[in-house]
């Protein structure tokens, strides 16, 4: 286990409703307030009425909302739902392995999250959905995710080492693509794996305001 990032000054609230992809209402300190949702995924298993959430006040005069949604309760733990942290988490993990790291590297009409040592192409995806002991991605259809897989496969054919890291924030022992929600992405992930794209599912938790890296979990194709 390894502490990655500390998220200070969070406050507890009660989720009321999601207005759209990026806006929700919660009950906080005896008031109904608007909060910004950074993760555009469906998050239906986390963002439902009366569920407990964590938010953080943002000091900015350029925003309509004064709070960011940080995490939502699932059973005995909080699950991170703030996708802005994904890059910081991934970079902390990758810098343990690589010395030279470039972020947001252009490839044709896409941008790949990281290029390490000028030869390892790495894409990052955040996963908040778990079903029993199985984490699943995506929780909504993702054409962009499928395109990223196609890019990694193309780079692999050119002789590069390519990786897709899944940052898993809901407790699980296994990871599988979500065939029911996005069959196209799931089959493409199988194809990428067969071609030699490395799939790395990493489990994290939110403990005492720290995002904690726990371990790599097992990949299973169960579709």
UniProtKB/Swiss-Prot annotation:
Gene encoding the protein: sfsA
HAMAP family named in the record: SfsA
UniProt xrefs under Gene3D superfamilies: 2.40.50.580, 3.40.1350.60
Lineage of source species: Bacteria, Thermotogati, Thermotogota, Thermotogae, Thermotogales
Name recorded for this polypeptide: Sugar fermentation stimulation protein homolog
Family in the record: Belongs to the SfsA family.
Any one Gene Ontology molecular-function term assigned to this protein's record: DNA binding
InterPro entries: SfsA, SfsA_C, SfsA_N
Source organism superkingdom: Bacteria
């Amino acid at each position: 286990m390894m502490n990655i990032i500390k998220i200070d000054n969070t406050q507890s609230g009660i989720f009321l409703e999601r207005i759209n992809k990026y806006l929700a209402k919660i009950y906080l300190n005896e008031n109904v307030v608007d909060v910004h949702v950074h993760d555009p995924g469906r998050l239906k298993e986390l963002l439902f009425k009366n569920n407990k959430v964590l938010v953080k006040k943002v000091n900015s005069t350029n925003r309509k909302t004064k709070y960011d949604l940080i995490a939502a309760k699932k059973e005995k733990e909080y699950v991170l739902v703030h996708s802005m942290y994904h890059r910081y988490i991934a970079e902390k993990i990758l810098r343990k392995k690589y010395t030279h790291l470039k972020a947001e590297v252009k490839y044709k009409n896409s941008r790949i999250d990281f290029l390490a040592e000028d030869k390892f192409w790495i894409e990052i995806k955040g996963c908040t959905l778990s079903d029993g002991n199985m984490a699943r991605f995506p929780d909504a259809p993702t054409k962009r995710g499928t395109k990223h897989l196609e890019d990694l496969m193309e780079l692999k054919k050119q002789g590069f080492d390519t990786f897709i890291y899944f940052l898993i924030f809901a407790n699980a022992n296994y990871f599988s693509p979500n065939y029911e929600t996005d069959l196209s992405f799931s089959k493409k992930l199988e194809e990428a794996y067969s071609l030699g794209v490395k799939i790395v599912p990493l489990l994290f938790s939110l403990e005492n305001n720290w995002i904690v890296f726990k371990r790599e979990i097992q990949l299973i194709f169960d579709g």
